[in-house]
Amino acid sequence: NPPGGRACIAASAMVWRMQLLPTLTTAHALFLDFDGTLTELAPRPEAVRVASGLIPTLSSLHAQLGGALAIVTGRPEADIDGFLAPLRLPLASEHGAQYRLFDTSVPATAPPALEPVLQAAQALAARHPGLLVETKRVSVALHYRLAPHLESLCHDTLVQAMREVDGVELLRGKCVFEVKPRGVHKGQAISDFMTQPPFAGRTPVFVGDDVTDEAGFAAVQALGGWGIKVGEGPTMAQHRCMTSA
């Protein structure tokens, strides 16, 4: 497509089913959450299934947008690269704690000393088999999708353990609590991308499904772009579609 031409996603149900949404063009920069947006949510993080046409569709969109497409996710970098192999896209992983524009990943945040949080989460999971502890480079996530009745216990356990760690905050997602460095969020990751080519000078669009994506919606809309919320629930995003890829 020539500059200013249309890279139309409206016909591409493999990315999302557009529902009265503005048309994406080559003047846009596209940022996509992963879980719940490009894939359906699964009981465990490793159980996510990638639709057969998703990788070629993302590759095509990346080319049509002149490289201005990035995944912005809470997952570790290795997870995304594994699910989307052999495709390697620009990526902000762990909510922006790790940042990859081209081939080299740059840690944006130093790992905090999370041992007290990790120990508390692991001890709780050992007593309740439905819980899952996920250790990332700069954070600890406690998943309770298989034990939703333990939500309050998970929350209180992590809050108590966080008192022993400086510079962290609790992030609530869909059936998960995550202890991460304070100030690290998807909005900052998107803002950082927008200062660099090929993203700079474009209108940003961010698609996400979770409360963890609200900072991303705020960032793109502050930059004159638009957010798309996938699914139900309150949001500051200007647009909504009801289904993921």
Residue ranges and their predicted role:
Residues N1-F34, L38-A42, G53, M194-T195:
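Non-catalytic pre-domain segments flanking phosphatase-related domains
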Residues G36, L91, L142, I190, ...:
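Residue-level signal for inorganic ion chemistry
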Residues R49-K136:
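Active-site phosphate-binding/coordination module
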Residues A51, G187-A245:
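Mg2+-dependent phosphoryl-transfer enzymes with acidic/Ser/Thr/Gly-rich catalytic loops
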Residues E94, R100-Q119, L171-G201:
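Substrate-recognition "cap/lid" segment bordering the active-site pocket of phosphatases
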Residues V117, A121, C154-M162:
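Short amphipathic alpha-helices in soluble, non-transmembrane regions
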Residues A125, Q160-G167:
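A common structural junction motif
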Residues L131-P148, G167-K180:
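Charged, glycine-interspersed solvent-exposed loop segments at helix/strand-loop junctions
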